[in-house]
């Protein structure tokens, strides 16, 4: 749908969704998360307007989905027991659980293959070509991998 409005560069990153709970929550596991979270008693925290919100609505239709403004607010809400789990991008979960929210853990990564790319004015083919070349060069020379490692993006 967005491709009607803008052109996109080549993909520079692929991401998936993650199910995050508090470390001391032993009730929800990688084996039973679908059953435990897809019921009327479950509250799932998501970032408003995100792909995680759409994923949660589609995969956990019986749960109460509570949107927050940003990922940090989502994790703060989970730490404050305002929900049973956060659904967010795997890269976001990886970074936040490693840094400021170490009382939270990713219990399940769900493969969704979300591609990240740069939006470009449809008529600007030179810019698109230049961006695609830069993405290729930065990938080939290891810069992308080095940045992902530096910022704990897995």
Per-region residue spans from a language model:
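Short helix-loop capping/hinge motifs at secondary-structure junctions, enriched
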Residues: 24-34, 66, 123-130
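Periplasmic-binding protein-like
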Residues: 14-21, 90, 94-136, 154
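Short loop->beta-strand "edge-of-pocket" segments that line small-molecule binding or catalytic clefts
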Residues: 32-49
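A ligand-binding cleft/hinge motif common to bilobed small-molecule-binding domains
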Residues: 1-5, 54-57, 76-113
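Hydrophobic residues within well-ordered alpha-helices
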Residues: 37, 77-79, 118, 131
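Acidic, polar ligand-binding/catalytic clefts
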Residues: 1-34, 105, 109-111
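Ligand-binding clefts/hinges and TM-proximal coupling segments of bilobed small-molecule sensing domains
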Residues: 41, 51-65, 106-108, 130, ...
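Short helix-initiation/N-cap motifs at beta->coil->alpha
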Residues: 31, 66-80, 114
């Amino acid at each position: 749908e967005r491709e009607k409005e803008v052109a996109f560069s080549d993909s520079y990153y692929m991401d998936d969704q993650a199910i995050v709970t508090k470390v001391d929550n032993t009730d929800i596991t990688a084996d039973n998360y679908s059953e435990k979270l897809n019921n009327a008693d479950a509250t799932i925290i998501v970032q408003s307007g995100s792909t995680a919100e759409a994923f949660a609505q589609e995969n956990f239709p019986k749960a109460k989905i509570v949107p927050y403004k940003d990922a940090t607010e989502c994790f703060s809400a989970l730490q404050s027991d305002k929900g049973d789990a956060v659904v967010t991008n795997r890269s976001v979960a990886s970074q936040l659980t490693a840094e400021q929210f170490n009382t939270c853990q990713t219990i399940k990564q769900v493969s969704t293959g979300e591609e990240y790319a740069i939006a470009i004015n449809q008529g600007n083919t030179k810019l698109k070509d230049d961006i695609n070349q830069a993405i290729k060069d930065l990938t080939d020379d290891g810069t992308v991998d080095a940045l992902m490692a530096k910022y704990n993006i897995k």
